[in-house]
Amino acid sequence: MTEMVPAWVEGRLMPVEKLEAHQRGLRHMAISVFVMAGEAVLIQRRAAGKYHTPGLWANTCCTHPRWGEEAADCAVRRLREELGITGLVTVFADRVEYRADVGNGLTEHEVVDIFVAEAPSDLPVNPDPEEVWETRWVDLTDLAREVKEHPERFTPWLRIYLAEHMERIFGKLRVVQ
């Protein structure tokens, strides 16, 4: 099935096939979700079969809204599809734009609506193995340190979020130095 995502072509937002958007480096819409339990964040390691950044650690989940889909609805959908997570309230935290080479001649040039959701630490997680290799809870401070020490283990977008947008995503109480 071809997945059509909202992308800008010659200044106009229109449906574009997802792989084509990455091959051409088109600016396109995306969502990212961070599920938090206190100061811990749920992160995922991307499945080995993903067509870009396989095996790298990323935020809880991220994807592209389908053409015509609202970002908030997309965030809830992908929590369910990727991780089997339901019933959380996702709250819009920020909109971020970035551009990053993700290997294999592909570029992510995303306008990302970022959502945060609070969860209990015993939240049931049931990852789809086609999407997610593994998950883990990690303290936000420890995650920021890990990303600085071993950036090659993490997706470009997670590195960008933590380096450039911590306060805007997590608020003043969760800013890590």
Swiss-Prot record:
Lineage: superkingdom: Bacteria
InterPro entries per the UniProt record, alphabetical: Idi_bact (IPR056375), IsopentenylPP_isomerase_typ1 (IPR011876), NUDIX_hydrolase-like_dom_sf (IPR015797), NUDIX_hydrolase_dom (IPR000086)
Binding residues annotated for Mg(2+), in chain numbering: 62, 82
EC number per UniProt: 5.3.3.2
Cystines in this chain: none
Alphabetical keyword list: Chlorophyll biosynthesis, Cytoplasm, Isomerase, Isoprene biosynthesis, Magnesium, Manganese, Metal-binding, Photosynthesis
Protein's UniProt name: Isopentenyl-diphosphate Delta-isomerase
Species for this entry: Cereibacter sphaeroides (strain ATCC 17023 / DSM 158 / JCM 6121 / CCUG 31486 / LMG 2827 / NBRC 12203 / NCIMB 8253 / ATH 2.4.1.) (Rhodobacter sphaeroides)
Pfam families associated with the record: NUDIX
First-level EC class: isomerase
Phylogenetic lineage: Bacteria, Pseudomonadati, Pseudomonadota, Alphaproteobacteria, Rhodobacterales
Gene from which the chain derives: idi
